[in-house]
C-alpha cells in the first residue's frame, strides 16, 4: 500500500501544527551572547495555558557544568510586556537537593501566580534567573511567555 503525496503533506502539516505544544513554550536566554554555567534545554508549563481557576507550575530542565552550592537564589519576575509586576525569590536548596553536582538538573517552581496576578492579565513575560550571591555570578537567565485562560469571578475581584 503506497502513501500518496497528499497524505504525506497532510501528515506533515498536522505534525507542524501540534509539535509546538509538545515542546513547551519557546524560551530564550536573557543575554544571547553569554554562556551560562547552567544551560537550559527545555521549559514546561503545566497546565499550558494556565487556567485562572487553578495555578501554574514551571519545570526547567538543563545541564550545569559546575557544582552549585548553598547560597544560590532563584528569581522569578513577572512582567506585562516590559512592565514589571512582581518578583519572587527562592533558595535553590528549597527547589532541589543541594549541592547540585555538575550534570543534569530539573527545577520545578509551583504556584507561580497569586490570585490577583491571575485576574489582571491574559499573559505574562516570565524571567527566571539563578544568581550565586557570594560571587555575584549569573548562572542562568531565561525568558518566555505564559498565557492564562478562563474567566475571573467578579465576586473574587470585589472581595480580594
UniProtKB/Swiss-Prot annotation:
Tissue expression profile of the protein: Expressed exclusively in roots, in epidermis and cortex cells of the root elongation zone, and lateral root cap cells at the root tip.
Disruption phenotype: No visible phenotype under normal growth conditions, but mutant plants exhibit decreased root basipetal auxin transport, faster root gravitropic response and increase in salt stress tolerance.
Keyword Lipid metabolism: no
GO molecular function, one term: phosphatidylethanolamine binding
Gene Ontology biological process terms in this record: intracellular sterol transport; positive gravitropism; response to salt stress
Matches recorded under InterPro entries: GM2-AP_sf (IPR036846), Ig_E-set (IPR014756), ML_dom (IPR003172), ML_PG-PI_TP (IPR033917), NPC2-like (IPR039670)
Signal sequence interval, chain numbering: 1-23
Entry's induction text: Induced by gravity stimulation.
Subunit-structure text: Interacts with SYT1.
Function of the protein: Involved in the regulation of gravitropic response and basipetal auxin transport in roots. Involved in salt stress tolerance. May facilitate membrane trafficking and asymmetric cell elongation via SYT1. Binds stigmasterol and dipalmitoyl phosphoethanolamine (DPPE) in vitro.
Protein name per the record: MD-2-related lipid-recognition protein ROSY1
Gene name for this UniProt entry: ROSY1
Amino acid at each position: 500500500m503506497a502513501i500518496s503525496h497528499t497524505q504525506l503533506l497532510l501528515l506533515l502539516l498536522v505534525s507542524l501544527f501540534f509539535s509546538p505544544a509538545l515542546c513547551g513554550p519557546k524560551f530564550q536566554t536573557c543575554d544571547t551572547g553569554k554562556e551560562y554555567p547552567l544551560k537550559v534545554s527545555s521549559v514546561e508549563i503545566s497546565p499550558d495555558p494556565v487556567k485562572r481557576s487553578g495555578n501554574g507550575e514551571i519545570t526547567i530542565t538543563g545541564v550545569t557544568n559546575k557544582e552549585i552550592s548553598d547560597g544560590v537564589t532563584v528569581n522569578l519576575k513577572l512582567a506585562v510586556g516590559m512592565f514589571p509586576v512582581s518578583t519572587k525569590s527562592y533558595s535553590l536548596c528549597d527547589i532541589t537537593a543541594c549541592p547540585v553536582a555538575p550534570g543534569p538538573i530539573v527545577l520545578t517552581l509551583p504556584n507561580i501566580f497569586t490570585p490577583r496576578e491571575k485576574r489582571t492579565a491574559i499573559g505574562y513575560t516570565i524571567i527566571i534567573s539563578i544568581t550565586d550571591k557570594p560571587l555575584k555570578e549569573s548562572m542562568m537567565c531565561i525568558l518566555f511567555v505564559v498565557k492564562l485562560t478562563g474567566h475571573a469571578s467578579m465576586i473574587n475581584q470585589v472581595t480580594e
